[in-house]
């Protein structure tokens, strides 16, 4: 990895990616590195390793492409956030993005709007498949898959089985009931807001589109 430290008396820069399809490149100014209790630094280093996956695997992996031919890839930011909080787990529930997670948790896990907030699904997948699973997911993704499509292929599950897993994930996250999260999540169990709900047929409720 190439690390470039820039001295800008009044500048703020933190950028992690790569260069020439060969190697990860981290660019920082001294004022940016320690921001957010060093989370910014760890996040951008995560991006460098993400770029390196693309370099090492011939542009077919690592989501340097836009999944499904769309625009953007929220999983890049989600995973960089998650990687940072594996270094600083005490901050995973105490940061500027956690409230955004609570407000948007009902949305699809790859939704673009809360791309910096959805950094918990990775913990669930590692809980089920081991800590090295995220590395496998990044290295073995195939253009034009998104992260969910790659996950389902690698784990060999159906749509119905994936939906069952998402229910299990949501049920566990109600009390942060997985080993990686239970210690620091214990104080946040009662933090979830209740989104606006609409009663529909057969005594079911669904989240209002206004949410």
Please give the residue ranges for each predicted region.
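Juxtacatalytic substrate-recognition/specificity segment
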Residues: 1-72, 90
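Extracellular structured ligand-interaction cores
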Residues: 2, 45, 77, 117-119
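Soluble non-cytosolic domains of exported or imported proteins
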Residues: 31-36, 40, 70, 74, ...
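Sec/Tat-exported extracytoplasmic proteins
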Residues: 44-45, 49-53, 83-91, 126-129, ...
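Substrate-binding/catalytic groove segments of enzymes
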Residues: 56-59, 90-95, 128-136
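Post-HExxH zinc-binding segment in Zn-dependent metallohydrolases
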Residues: 64-112, 124
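Extracytoplasmic, non-cytosolic globular domains
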Residues: 79, 83, 117-163
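Beta/coil-rich, acidic/histidine-enriched accessory regions frequently appended to metallopeptidases
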Residues: 144-211
């Amino acid at each position: 990895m190439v690390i470039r430290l820039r001295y800008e008396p009044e500048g703020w820069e933190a950028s992690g990616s790569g260069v020439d399809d060969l190697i990860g490149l981290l660019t920082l100014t001294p004022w940016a590195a320690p921001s957010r209790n060093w989370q910014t630094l760890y996040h951008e280093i995560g991006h460098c390793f993400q770029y390196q996956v693309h370099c090492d695997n011939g542009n077919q992996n690592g989501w340097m492409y836009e999944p499904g031919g769309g625009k953007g890839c929220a999983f890049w930011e989600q995973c960089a956030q998650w990687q940072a909080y594996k270094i600083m787990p005490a901050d995973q529930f105490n940061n500027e993005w956690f409230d955004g997670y609570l407000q948007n948790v009902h949305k699809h896990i790859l939704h673009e709007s809360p791309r910096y907030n959805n950094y918990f699904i990775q913990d669930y997948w590692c809980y089920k498949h081991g800590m090295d699973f995220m590395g496998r997911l990044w290295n073995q993704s195939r253009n034009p898959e998104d992260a969910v499509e790659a996950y389902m292929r690698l784990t060999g599950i159906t749509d119905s089985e994936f939906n069952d897993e998402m229910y299990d994930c949501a049920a566990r996250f109600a009390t942060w009931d997985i080993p990686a999260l239970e210690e620091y999540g214990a104080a946040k169990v009662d933090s979830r807001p209740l989104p606006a709900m609409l009663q529909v047929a057969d005594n079911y409720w669904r989240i209002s589109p206004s949410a």
